[in-house]
């Protein structure tokens, strides 16, 4: 009451009324704004005002000895007055012009090296092409983007160590350069910067630009790679966009792009192997991208993409806490839920067991071409606000949200059976079954969803089941907005776990990622990806599998032939023969394998027809589980080039051609390597491996009984002699050594002695 009386009193005075009604409200605020604090509030105005003065710049006193008092036009360049509050002189902007024209020249050789990122940017802009300007509403969403083209991917700490080592090599302080990239960069930069006169601080700044990825959270409508972001201010405004093609690419964008392709290929391949996690790790460790180990790139590169994140999780690295479903990144912004198993019936009366999220939750959904805000309760979609580039993208987002809502009308909209499988022919989980079903055809889903009258809300519009916009009606709870939904800004990373089937979970057990979420999009990598793992041979098709398999046998022939004679089963089980099996017609795989294994056994035992070329040629066929049959084959079929091609058991064919003279093997006309030994003397290789520990005494001696096969030799006692049948069907006399020490020399001498004994 007291306050009200006081206010009435004030209002009765005419002056008060005048002040309150006539003065603009922000008058005081403005005065306050420009007079409080040390921070300059209007830098550009301040700059213009200062530059209008005669001597706006201060400089060190020494400048007066280096610059004349007046220039050629007689204009004063510096004032005899000292700058108030410092011992510097006041200088005119004209002095800068004089210095630029007449000042001392230094060597410019280091400038392009130090200011490399700037010089490269100028080149990109010079060769870039700017297209027409289009005026249209821009749906921008804030994304975390790389604003610094042409950088390496060192962490801030790694870069700091490199910079200290390059710029201040003699400073004290512990610097440990461990990674390969650190060492390479340091060496390169030290060489480049010999006798460099540019100030060390400037060099340090520029090096930082070159070494560290800088990201900002910016509104973007188009391309997000760094060569587009550097011209963001030229290519998109609030209501316009300008087409632009960069005049050059930078390695960091190429690395990001190639990393995504490599990771997708590896996850897809690992998912179909017997032990997906082990396979994935093996492939990540044996793959190089542009000459750098993929695992090193994964440790340094912050790219967030489903396949990349699965690889990171497998390596024990932290990843973003958002989860992926239907190709959209979901981030819960409020609410919470508990999960409970529930059985539901589809429209086809098929029972599905789904994990229901009970509770109210809000999510942002961000995809490549559409974004949305989703509010849901237990098995109920409350509201979905979508924005997207086109009708198709908007529809994709709506389907994903409807499936994610787990609403009953969605499950009842299923027509037909759900039996989608992944690449490994395993049934997908129910949520992905539903998703695949409606991604194929969402007509029934949209028709059954229900429609409602809508209020007129600024910037929002309804959408009908046939995806046409409307201002009157809309599918229940669904609206289309002109504004995009920002990507989740936090760069926070969490510890995750990954199971054998590559499902990634956070510490509460929520599934964040799984192989089903990995995009099937194929692209061509910008940098060369070298997959050393045999699992990736099939990425370039059947021919590549064939060539790679034979190349591998030839490269490893020394160890292969020893295993061939001593431990064939272990050899047949080698993973390098796995890809080859997909080329052999399924129906006959087992028979081929049985036939080849029998043939090999005869070679080892009786016939003495050891033939290197034949072993190499037939070995991959022996890897399949064998079927016992009496069938004999003169040729074996492989499916390449879209049809069955024959490999002859004896002799050459277009598929497998060995040239005795050059010792070169060509597979389908492609070079598969050179054999280091002559196949006719190939027996020596296996024999010498097997005859270690035996001394070859000479030709066959009947007194020592019938010839044994190589496999039977192991039964001899030390010092005992026996006849033995070797590769070409010849028999020699051997004695088991009394001492083990000289075994190593046996394999070398065996070859020579076998020849002497035979001849």
UniProtKB/Swiss-Prot annotation:
Q: What does the record give as the function of this protein?
A: Plays an essential role in transcription initiation and cap-stealing mechanism, in which cellular capped pre-mRNAs are used to generate primers for viral transcription. Recognizes and binds the 7-methylguanosine-containing cap of the target pre-RNA which is subsequently cleaved after 10-13 nucleotides by the viral protein PA. Plays a role in the initiation of the viral genome replication and modulates the activity of the ribonucleoprotein (RNP) complex.
Spell out the HAMAP family in the cross-references.
Answer: INV_PB2
Q: Name one Pfam family in it.
A: Flu_PB2_7th
Q: Which organism is it from?
A: Influenza A virus (strain A/USA:Albany/12/1951 H1N1)
CC terms in the record's Gene Ontology section: host cell mitochondrion; host cell nucleus; virion component
Protein name as catalogued: Polymerase basic protein 2
- What keywords were assigned to this record? Cap snatching, Eukaryotic host gene expression shutoff by virus, Eukaryotic host transcription shutoff by virus, Host gene expression shutoff by virus, Host mitochondrion, Host nucleus, Host-virus interaction, Inhibition of host innate immune response by virus, Inhibition of host MAVS by virus, Inhibition of host RLR pathway by virus, Inhibition of host RNA polymerase II by virus, mRNA capping, mRNA processing, Viral immunoevasion, Viral transcription, Virion
Q: Which GO terms describe its molecular function?
A: RNA binding; RNA-directed RNA polymerase activity
Chain ranges for the short sequence motif Nuclear localization signal as given in the UniProt record: 736-739
The record lists the lineage as: Viruses, Riboviria, Orthornavirae, Negarnaviricota, Polyploviricotina
